[in-house]
Regions:
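Nucleotide-activated sugar donor-binding and catalytic core shared by glycosyltransferases
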Residues: 1-172
Length: 172
């Protein structure tokens, strides 16, 4: 019994001191992971774009890297077209994990990627939005968190923002 990510632990190593020092003088890297489903990308992109702008206003320049799930590039490009900052899109697992090693922080949709980020040592904020109909199901489900690492830890160590709580201000 286990999780398939255990087999990939070698790829999920936190960045080394050498990698951290090599990036000195460069703007910090912010990973943006809006999900792999069309509905996730559509529901989260506006709030993620607003959060990026607030982070940039508070911290100055940031390098934004957005790993694109297989088959979702068109949806992602459409969803981020209105963002005033243009993220670097990366494809495939190798590029995604390389971006993890460069990242200072991540803004992520809830899902398996939160476990990948945790195993990689990347601090994150997690967001999720569902349809009004799906939101009604919350009354049938009793879980303390939607973030896999929080469930594993048994505590809410990673901030999560759902539905109306998912705003650019909260995410930034």
């Amino acid at each position: 019994v286990g999780h398939p990510l255990i087999e990939r632990l070698g790829e999920l190593q936190p960045r080394t001191a050498d990698e951290a020092h090599a990036r000195e003088g460069s703007p910090p890297t912010l990973l943006v992971l809006p999900g792999s489903r069309r509905s996730e990308i559509a529901r989260l992109s506006e709030d993620f774009g607003g959060a990026i702008m607030q982070v940039r206003a508070a911290m100055g320049p940031v390098e934004v890297v957005l790993p694109v799930a297989d088959g979702r590039e068109m949806e992602v490009r459409s969803a981020i077209a209105g963002w005033p900052i243009h993220p670097t899109l990366v494809h495939g697992e190798a590029e995604k994990f390389a971006a993890f090693r460069r990242a200072r922080a991540a803004l992520a949709a809830s899902g398996t990627v939160t476990l990948e980020l945790a195993l990689s040592g990347v601090p994150m904020v997690v967001a999720y939005k569902v349809s009004k109909l799906e939101e009604q199901l919350k009354y049938l489900i009793d879980v303390p968190s939607i973030v896999l690492p929080n469930l594993i830890l048994g505590e809410n160590a990673i901030p999560e923002f759902l539905q109306k709580e998912c705003t650019p201000e909260a995410l930034a």
